[in-house]
UniProtKB/Swiss-Prot annotation:
It comes from the Eukaryota. The keyword Acetylation does not apply. This is Charged multivesicular body protein 3. Probable core component of the endosomal sorting required for transport complex III (ESCRT-III) which is involved in multivesicular bodies (MVBs) formation and sorting of endosomal cargo proteins into MVBs. MVBs contain intraluminal vesicles (ILVs) that are generated by invagination and scission from the limiting membrane of the endosome and mostly are delivered to lysosomes enabling degradation of membrane proteins, such as stimulated growth factor receptors, lysosomal enzymes and lipids. Involved in late stages of cytokinesis. Plays a role in endosomal sorting/trafficking of EGF receptor. A motif (MIT-interacting motif) lies at residues 200-210. It comes from Danio rerio. The gene is chmp3. Residues 59-64, 168-169 are annotated as: Important for autoinhibitory function. The lineage of its organism: Eukaryota, Metazoa, Chordata, Craniata, Vertebrata. Its main location: cytoplasm. It is a lipid-anchor. Keywords: Coiled coil, Cytoplasm, Endosome, Lipoprotein, Membrane, Myristate, Protein transport, Transport.
Length: 221
């Protein structure tokens, strides 16, 4: 505390170092999230192979769609890491500017990156706090909430889903299910692939699928 109870402003260099540390910490959070989703993906792949052997094409399609959503979530997380690296690089540049000009400068690059990063649920709270600190320091301007973000995700998912489902099933089952140009409606007869599951087994499998879907949804949210 300074005189009359006022908090003294931190030197710009200290602010930049603090921001860089926080960003690196959040990058590790993103890395863990990616690894967790990838581990669940491996379980889904095994479940698809098992379901394919039993001729359960509906189960395979459901799980393949989960794989698609997970891959998209991972791609978004990797994109976030790239943006965070961009901010870190800009912070280094700010230190160079500070040494020459004695003050921090506005950065449109940091502004754009932070606008995207505040929308990532895993790191949202930290990125919002950092944005406020950067606005106060004069590096970025006040950001407006983008309420339109993500509105087209479901439509895009539906348009691309069928082709992607075929591709994933073809790859995971080594060609037993799914075909590059055609849809998964021409799957082999279940009897030809494997024995039909008993009602008890089907109930257990449904529970396992629901649990798997819940875990993946939790990791992606």
């Amino acid at each position: 505390m300074g005189l009359f109870g006022k908090t003294q402003e931190k030197p710009p260099k200290d602010l930049i170092n603090e921001w860089s540390l926080k960003i690196r910490k959040e990058m590790r959070v993103i890395d863990r999230q990616i690894r967790d989703i990838q581990r669940e993906e491996e379980k889904v792949k095994r479940s698809i192979k098992d379901a394919a052997k039993k001729g359960q094409k509906d189960v395979c399609i459901i799980l393949a769609k989960e794989m698609i959503q997970s891959k998209r979530a991972i791609n978004k997380l990797y994109a976030s890491k790239a943006q965070m690296n961009s901010v870190l690089l800009s912070m280094k540049n700010q230190l160079s500017v500070l040494r020459v000009a004695g003050a921090l400068q506005k950065s449109t690059e940091v502004m754009k990156a932070m606008q995207s990063l505040v929308k990532i649920p895993e790191i949202q709270a930290t990125m919002r706090d950092l944005s406020k600190e950067m606005m106060k320091a004069g590096i970025i301007e006040e950001m407006l909430e983008d309420t339109l973000e993500g509105m087209d995700d479901e439509e895009e998912m539906e348009e691309a889903a069928e082709a992607e489902v075929d591709k994933i099933l073809f790859e995971i089952t080594a060609g037993a299910l799914g075909k590059a140009p055609s849809k998964v409606t021409d799957l082999p007869d279940p009897v030809a692939i494997g024995a039909t599951a008993a009602p008890e087994e089907e109930s257990e499998e449904e529970e396992e699928i629901e649990e798997m879907q819940s875990r993946l949804a939790a990791l992606r949210s």
